[in-house]
Amino acid sequence: MEEFQGYLELDIFRQHDFLYPLIFREYSYALGHGHGLNRYMLLENIGYDNKSSLLIVKRLITTMYQQNYLIISANDSKQNPFFGYNKNLHSKILSEGFAIIVEIPFYLRLISSLEGAEIVRFYNLRSIHSIFPFLEEKFPHLNYSADILIPYPAHLEILVQTLRYRVKDASYLHLLRFFLHEYSNCNSLIITNKSISIFSKSNPRFFLFLYNSYICEYESIFLFLRNQSSHLRLTSSGVLFERLCLYRKIEHFAEVFANDFPVIPCFLKDPFMHYVRYQGKSILASKDTPLLMNKWKSYLVNLWQCHFDVWSHAASIRINQLSKHSLDFLSYFSSVRRNPAVVRNQMLENSFLLNNAPNKLDTIVPIIPLIGSLAKAKFCNAVGHPISKLTRADLSDFEIINRFLHICRNLSHYYSGSSKKKNMYRIKYILRLSCVKTLARKHKSTARAFLKRVDSEFFQEFFTEEGGFISLIFPRASFALRRLYSGRVWYLDIIFINGLSNHE
């Protein structure tokens, strides 16, 4: 974005956030399409030459304002040469242009907030596994959790009103409002969960921007409530939870809270309330009794219903005890398990035994969802029996083995923090036997006959466990390292969830 800051002539629009003229700049849409506007628009639109023109963008906007367009049927679109290429093409082009333009003020505010601020970068914290050492320390002290699905607003005006706090250009907001309403009327989008999924796939950048704006507005109010009801101030990053003019809006918030939340009980002083947002869900965890969790659940439901006009039912939010229920987080089933231990104490001539049972974080591999992912990828059937996988005929045996080996190592690497290794052994067994059946199918043989025919060293690397590698490298310290390997190991080089592990 830095390289286009001067190109977009942002100095002219910085003072008043005047974004409307940028809609008629062709390079705005080129940026939105990743410099592929000509290829995308002209290949599907028969009748235009190989040069994009500003008239195309103007015609798209003009067409939106035509009254007869709202009643164009599918048959009319086939007869109309302008709509003959793709009936959603103009909406997709404008949505991506809207997204790249409306991100400009947010980017400038982010840059201004970072100026003069010395932020230490810890690259190891980019790893997904870096959150689990924190959970090992905090999670055993928590008792209850609530897994809440964040509802998405069905009314389009809520999305526009959310942007009003940040974007000051009235002309741009009017065009954005008209575009959203026109798009929903013609395609019935942003009304149901299915339509939201379609909208997110057809306009990913625009959908993510609207969704993040809504989530940011919701979390700003929720975190404000949390700070006001807690003895301890919230520890968070200013960049992650950056809010525009938050303290200027405190007076307005006070009026909203007075209407929507008549009473905030003084006993809601919980320094152990933890909040996490993960894949469209809010996770609340607390140390206190279920009464506090029920109070916060009611506040969230009232916040969505009264402030965002989003329907959410309190009965759909379940509060679970962590010692009895697992929490699905980052493709692990995490729970609190009591770890009983007997300690023998000696005091002078007297000795006695102490029973100590501290809580411990228990992380388990989600075996059933993982087998479902393997079955979807054609490594096994629905019950977990390995099957041969279709491969290209020109692949050599070593290339096939390396592909299976790469998948097996990635899964083993990601689930190295599991408390129980038996589930991971079953996943490795499925992948190994699937590899053997794939090779046997390629050579038109059975798995047993193929294993007898090949050399034993052929699968040596594939069938060697990670613990075997450690014992080969460090034979004298193999006992200690094997004990370390049998425990949880968190790696600091994992920056994304494996595709097979991401079963959400």
Curated annotation (Swiss-Prot):
Gene Ontology cellular-component annotations: chloroplast
Main location: plastid
GO molecular function: RNA binding
Domain of life, per lineage: Eukaryota
Pfam families: Intron_maturas2, MatK_N
Keyword Signal included in the entry's annotation: no
Localization terms from the record: Plastid, Chloroplast
Keyword RNA-binding set for record: yes
Entry-linked InterPro entries: Domain_X, Maturase_MatK, Maturase_MatK_N
Transmembrane segments: none
GO biological processes: mRNA processing; RNA splicing; tRNA processing
Coiled coil: none
Record key words, sorted: Chloroplast, mRNA processing, Plastid, RNA-binding, tRNA processing
Similarity field: Belongs to the intron maturase 2 family. MatK subfamily.
Biological role: Usually encoded in the trnK tRNA gene intron. Probably assists in splicing its own and other chloroplast group II introns.
UniProt name for this protein: Maturase K
Organism: Quercus petraea (Durmast oak)
